[in-house]
């Protein structure tokens, strides 16, 4: 309980001065940017529109850095990536109606991947709200309804004095585990109206901790300590909570093999003797996981991709640690612990007993050898060569962002991320066009290291306009486009299912010439020269494009 004596209510001298002498000409938009600054934001993403101009005008009177993209969906992807790599809430400023709706696919990805995006959209003037049809430009009967199924929370403003508290509440919601996108909407007239309210100088929106119940972690520790064949599945929650070190400590304490989900890439060292890497779409890995007598799942809901397309059927006891309450036991019954991964792992480390199993590393080697033999039998040398070239060219600490393309599907299973929180993809919601705008968002967060984006030619066309953004802000992003003349993965799916593919072949531009028309240097490469060309592009300042004409294939599935 909070008591009066715990609070510091007296303003500082600077706060009093700012409150009593606010600058002239401030409006509701100023309250928005002042609140964001007070909460600690430094960078905002977005795209202006008529109803939102009050917010955008206020940006020039603030210290916020604005990164404007060419399409709202891409601005949302950029904010998503900024939130992933920094762990901070990423403000996304949008206009009403079409502008707001264009962001929905990006917000769905942010929700699926637990990325903290603070979307602030405008509305028609307050007089036009209420569900009727007044004929305002961009008008929707219920704009919020379009967002409620996607975001964590919706926050409505109708008066200027509500702006700071509404944004603070949204900020707290976005950053309370599980992280996720939130929606705030403010009418046009509220944003434009002059305000006599004092400058916003003191904001507090501390996210709430999701603490494990001790009786649950006590039982979990006992099960792990006495297990004969414990195994750990590490998901994206481990990465988001910065718990990779604690995960490794626990695995080594009980000699438990660890496999990372595609969202958990980098959570556990790839070459560690206990590392099963990320081969979740391989039946050898699935069989090994099913044989565990105690399976600890940390920060994963064991969804479609993490369960080898729902063919995974554990025979032992499942312990699931998950910050998203709706995911607890949603796919497999077991001991569900609603908690942040870092806090739960800390509790387990304090209570679990040491357990030694010299055979664990041997078992891991056997599984990986079986996986390797299966892949080697499929004549997929080109695909492995291309992926190895990307890994060789990319600095260990550089983030990479992967679109929904065949090379990304390979990377989910076979790419060594080397560091936590460096490999990201759109595998949460699975929409096209994520890679390049997301990489721009990560580069805006840290310009000191190069960022890699990987797309196919089909996905690249979703975000080609953002070459202008990359050039305008001189962001250090290298975009690798694998050009196979169509939607390659869908071509494979349809050919396997129906004998031939339909609607998958594409007439695409000359990506090298197109990039150069934006003032972005571009190179056409080959599998043999990819490593050298990609490393050279990553080493140069500013944006660049590398185009690889290649027809890649997927490894055979094991879930059919």
Model-identified regions with their sequence ranges:
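N-terminal alpha/beta PP-like core and its mobile active-site loop of ThDP/TPP-dependent enzymes
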Residues: 2-353, 393-396, 476-479, 515
